[in-house]
Curated annotation (Swiss-Prot):
Inorganic phosphate and glucose-6-phosphate antiporter. May transport cytoplasmic glucose-6-phosphate into the lumen of the endoplasmic reticulum and translocate inorganic phosphate into the opposite direction. The lineage of its organism: Eukaryota, Metazoa, Chordata, Craniata, Vertebrata. PANTHER family: GLUCOSE-6-PHOSPHATE EXCHANGER SLC37A2, MAJOR FACILITATOR SUPERFAMILY TRANSPORTER 16, ISOFORM B. GO terms for molecular function: glucose 6-phosphate:phosphate antiporter activity. This is Glucose-6-phosphate exchanger SLC37A2. The gene is slc37a2. It comes from Danio rerio.
Length: 494
């Protein structure tokens, strides 16, 4: 008898449910990568909108009135250009923070496929409109602010929808690890966005926005054609979100940790009535842990986004690297964030303590930030090592809260009979965090003239506050560990 080809053996070794789960994980990864890809060009194009024109060769037929600003793009040619760039950033971030609270409410009441695909199409439109200002010769600050604000609003469709979709397909077993790996889409999108924008920024900066706009709009079409919202829609087995065991501490993971792609994940679940009515905003706030994790993320995201917007400038000013090298080194913070998110997911899966894992990483992050400010620029190896450590410790809790914790709370045991809470809970948590994302860079801009030390003291204080806000949940988890002596930890052999 002829043996099957190795590739066919591999394909047939996975069940139909497993293939669907893998496809959902891959599609949502691509979708949110495109969201971040379309956000990145503005940080790359800023250096082109305002340059040192005295070093630029001007065309012979051009009448130059100001040798220092002739090549700048009005209205960013004045001495207040940094303030105007700050206005552009905050137009996006504030609109994103406000819109996120409403996004989840709409996401629970509209089909995720339509909601997500429409959001990506509109994001592509507004991203491209910013770039079209180059070809239409638009020099009005209000135009660019309006486009940024509208883009910030429609970008809120992404995160609650993709987390809700992944939460619908994956149970609690190994959710932290899977989502920790999956959450790398943030860094992948940032890197791709930088590379694509960099190709066109010097020749025609409008294309730095138009091309990413076309990419995210194209992924919106793919979403409309291929996204499956729930396992039940294609007759797949629904995942296990709850356990039939004695009461456990808040956010405890399944001690059995079922295989994440196993098609038989719901056999131990009691059938429960599933009402189709979506949860209200106030109802989502009453879910145990939502308020604490939301406020924790506010301060955690404040630290993360301050690094995102100010780290290259800090490295250039303090370590005296040129702008390109400073930008390249700053990407190590994102690399550390990927590793931190994966480690946080693994540890929280193994211990069952989401809050304890976040708190431990935040506690260690505070002294590491202090050390980075003091010794982080003493040579290239030290800089690389400290950036990786700080990125892991700062972004690890941020990644865990926005992914696994949001999915856990959106399928919390108190919601039996009302499963439509994932999108609203995710929006509340990420929306609160986005307030910190808007405030952090703004505070850094106000504090940095007084010295970089004060900026780091602000970041350390935010880290400590984030940790303190989880103290009640950590106490409950520790009590649970001490009270349930027969409880097993670790991953069950499959």
């Amino acid at each position: 008898m002829k043996s099957l080809a190795p590739g066919i053996k591999l394909i047939t070794s996975f069940s139909r449910d497993s293939w669907y789960r893998f496809s959902i994980l891959f599609l949502t990864f691509v979708f949110y990568t495109s969201y971040h890809l379309s956000r990145k060009p503005i940080s790359i194009v800023k250096s082109q909108l305002h340059r040192n024109c005295s070093n630029v060769v001007h065309p012979a037929n051009l009448n130059i009135t100001d040798n220092d600003t002739w090549c700048d793009w009005v209205p960013f040619d004045g001495k207040n250009y940094q303030n105007l760039f700050g206005v552009l950033d905050n137009c996006f971030l504030v609109a994103y923070a406000v819109g996120m609270f409403f996004s989840g409410i709409f996401g629970e009441r509209l089909p995720l496929r339509y909601y997500l695909s429409t959001g990506m199409l509109l994001s592509g439109l507004f991203t491209a409109l910013f770039g079209l200002g180059f070809y239409w010769q638009i020099h009005s600050l209000w135009y660019y602010c309006l486009v940024q604000a509208l883009n910030g609003l429609v970008q809120t469709t992404g995160w609650p929808a993709v987390v809700a979709c992944v939460g619908n397909w994956f149970g609690k077993g190994k959710r932290g690890f899977i989502m920790g790996v999956w959450n790398s889409h943030t860094s992948v999108g940032n890197i791709l966005g930088s590379l694509i924008a960099g190709v066109y920024v010097s020749s025609a900066w409008g294309l730095s926005f138009i091309v990413p706009g076309i990419i995210i709009a194209s992924t919106g079409v793919i979403c409309f054609l291929f996204l499956v919202e729930r396992p039940e829609d294609v007759n797949c087995t629904a995942p296990q979100h709850h356990e039939r065991v004695e009461e456990e501490p808040l956010l405890r993971n399944s001690s059995t940790n079922e295989e994440i792609f196993n098609s038989h994940t719901s056999t131990a679940v009691e059938p429960v009535e599933d009402h189709s009515e979506a949860i209200s905003f106030c109802g989502a706030l009453r879910i145990p842990g939502v308020v604490e994790f939301s406020l924790c993320l506010l301060f955690a995201k404040l630290v993360s986004y301050t690094f995102l917007y100010w780290l290259p400038l800090y490295i250039a000013n303090v370590a005296h690297f040129d702008p390109k090298k400073a930008g390249d080194l700053s990407t190590l913070f994102d690399v550390g964030g990927i590793l931190g998110g994966i480690v946080a997911g693994l540890v929280s899966d193994y211990t069952g303590g989401r809050a304890s894992t976040c708190c431990a990483m935040l506690i260690i992050a505070a002294p590491m930030l202090f050390l980075y400010n003091k010794i982080g620029q003493n040579g290239l190896p030290t800089t690389v090592g400290m950036l990786l450590w700080c990125g892991a410790l700062v972004n690890g809790p941020y990644a865990l809260i926005t992914t696994a914790v949001s999915a856990d709370l959106g399928t919390h045991e108190c919601l039996r009979g009302n499963s439509r809470a994932l999108s609203t809970v995710t929006a509340i948590i990420d929306g609160t965090g986005s307030i910190g994302a808007a405030v952090g860079p703004l505070l850094a801009g106000l504090i940095s003239p007084t010295g970089w030390n004060n900026v780091f003291y602000m970041l350390i204080a935010a880290d400590v506050l984030a940790c303190l806000l989880l103290s009640r949940l950590v106490y409950k988890e520790i009590r649970g560990w001490c009270g349930y002596t027969t409880r097993q930890r670790g991953f069950k052999e499959i």
